Amino acid sequence: MKTPHKCRVPGLSIGCTSFIIPDYYVPAIRECVHYADDIALLLLEAGDHGEGLITPAEIRELAGIAADAGVKWNVHLPTDGGFATEESGRRYTENIIRAIDLTRELEPHTWVMHVVTDHIPGPDMRLHLTERETERILRSLEQITPHLPAPECLALENLERHPTDYLDKLVSATPHSRCFDIGHVWKEGLRPEELLPLWLPDIRMCHLHGLEKRDHKSLHHMPAATLDAILHPMWDIRFSPLITLEVFSLDDFLNSHQAMLESHERYISKH
């Protein structure tokens, strides 16, 4: 285990995922609080009826740990579902609501949600949502909203293999927010710095991760110019939403933090 220390970046708010420590939720979070001020609780697999979710007893323990450590939460909602059919959409919505209700005790600032028609993506770019799919998803979001402390606490995440404007109609038609996943934009060979000003009014939080054969790897794999192209404008505008370093090992988290510090040094040297 590395010597614990809080990882912070001047002028930006960063956090880690609950997966940087390979353990069950409670022992993992006991370690995570030493490294970050904000933790993404990843509840990725709910099962058919929520049987795969964290237990209420574990949530109570996590609430106590976080209160003692002074850390904040965001929650990544289950991803093992989607809106391909009316029935799959109904099950997925029920599990999303279960996860929100279960974690309300933690008082998260954000719940992050995937909006997909098929939760097992193929290799090809997804088409835009059809009118029927859009209506199905909007009905689901209407059911989810009453379970939130405020509608903007739900952030819809952009995904790889989906058009960048895939979520535009949903965001404009609802009071919900965006989770800007920068790594997913890089994975498609696109430039997230071009999307930043377009999406800025709706961004609740960000996911940031590098690419090395696949995504969700350390930022130190990214060319300095690529990382600077998105981070330097954030410092320019005093970007305030949380940036979760969405990596799944402690080494990748610490190396990503170091890469951000080096980017900040380059930023300072130019100003």
Label each PLM-derived region with a short phrase.
Residues G47-G50, G81-E86, H119-M125, K213-S218:
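A short acidic, helix-capping loop that chelates divalent metal ions and anchors anionic groups
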Residues K2-S13, P27-E31, G82-T85, T93, ...:
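Histidine-acidic metal/acid-base catalytic patches
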Residues L12-S18, D37-L41, W73-L77, W111-M113, ...:
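Hydrophobic faces of well-ordered beta-strands that scaffold small-molecule active sites
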Residues I59-H76, E135-H147, D228-M234:
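Alpha-helix-loop-beta-strand connector modules within alpha/beta enzyme cores
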Residues T17-I21, L42-A46, P78-G82, V116-D118, ...:
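Active-site beta-loop-alpha junctions enriched in small/polar residues
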Residues M1-R98, K270-H271:
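N-terminal pre-domain/capping segments
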Residues Y35, A69, A150-P151, T174, ...:
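Structured helix-beta-strand junction loops
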